[in-house]
Amino acid sequence: MNNHLPDKKANGGKRKLNNGKFRQQIELQSMIVPGLLLIMVFAYIPLCGIIVAFKDYNLYTGILGSPWVGLKHFQAFFSDRNFVEIMRNTLVISMLKLIFGFPAPIILAVLLNEIANIRNRRFFQTITYMPHFISWVVVAGMLVTLLSMDGGTVNSVLMSLGIIKEPLNFLSNPSYFWTILVSANVWKSTGFNAIIFMAAISGISPDLYEAAALDGASRFKQIFVITLPCIMTQIVIVLILNVSNILNAGFDDILLLTNNGENRILMSVADVIDTYVYRVGIKAQRFSFATAAGVFKSVINIIMLLAANGISRKLGDVSLW
């Protein structure tokens, strides 16, 4: 019995110490309350609506009054004649965004870190962050101005240089859609996504760079032997999170660039799970069908998250948990 008394006292002392720290940091702790409330209201409470996917939901009878239909809506989604095309578009667009959008913030963060003048660095940081705060409605308007056949900037420049004789229909040609969509996404998100890598780079000790410089390493070599290895943990974590969103190909950007889904020519390469759910499920008031498609997407994303996290833990001992 006596052998356990010191452990109990130690545990009690730790609890008191932790409680004391919590009370001292109560103002800091309270700052997370709004975020927790938002997550609770918009992420966890709506999970109760998952049962709609297994019912033939009717607005008049409500969730509890609607009859159970099992996997009927999942079967309808998988057997839809557009399912293969939708999955292809979703995966291709997501992979293109991952291939070009994932390394771009890392490269930008490294380049910004190489700017010695702090004032110039902050200026370029601000310039690169700004696109993130521009609405997709505005971005779509900018793309129309740039790529329109009727007086579009790109067509005007190409024709003035003699590269083309007639204006190209960029906005209604399926061959250009993926390029335009991915380019716009990379431009819009790169600066903001670079923040986490800039923060990680700022935590690297300057002594490492000084020691490398004394050993004759150039600035370019220092990037590969110091900067990138030191932020590899952050790189892997961000990659895991990106892989877990493999079926989130986009919604508002695609919807705006396809004229609210009315451009049938583009929909053959633009229709993804989210736009399909909006068009077939929400607009047609097939709420159970839309929920089933959303549940399918969420399950696949969770599986990808678990797989990516497990592979990362085995290969590099870096994981989310």
Feature locations, PLM:
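A structural signal for multi-pass alpha-helical bundles of membrane permease subunits
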Residues: Q24-W321
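Short, Lys/Arg-rich, polar N-terminal cytosolic tail immediately upstream
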Residues: M1-F22
